[in-house]
């Protein structure tokens, strides 16, 4: 089975750019009810995944930061505490399953590290659930 079977394409996925402000990211997370979101550079390369926890730690360590001030702080200033690794479009199912066990979603990139979408743990579980008649 090919991992592309599970792919949710980029145009159906929320993501941010590493040039966004902390406030823009917080608002996007809040608007969509996410706790983490893929981050891309301006060329569309996958950079990392930023989480609410990463932002909270940044705020904790920069207590003078207000919501207003967060409009002027770029999200790339926030340290990523837990790497969410991507897989290549040519990855095998074993690679996907290894990652999806530990991540809610797995970013998928092409050979040039361009972000092409995500695979969610929910979709993988749903497939195997239906396949086994549960």
Predicted segments, located by residue:
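A short, polar/charged loop-to-alpha-helix boundary motif
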Residues: 54-70, 124-134
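Short hydrophobic beta-strand motif reused across regulatory alpha/beta modules
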Residues: 47-55, 106, 117-124
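Bateman (tandem CBS) regulatory domains
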Residues: 1-13, 70-83
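Short, well-structured hydrophobic secondary-structure segments
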Residues: 35-39, 43-52
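The conserved cystathionine-beta-synthase
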Residues: 15-34, 40-41, 59, 84-103, ...
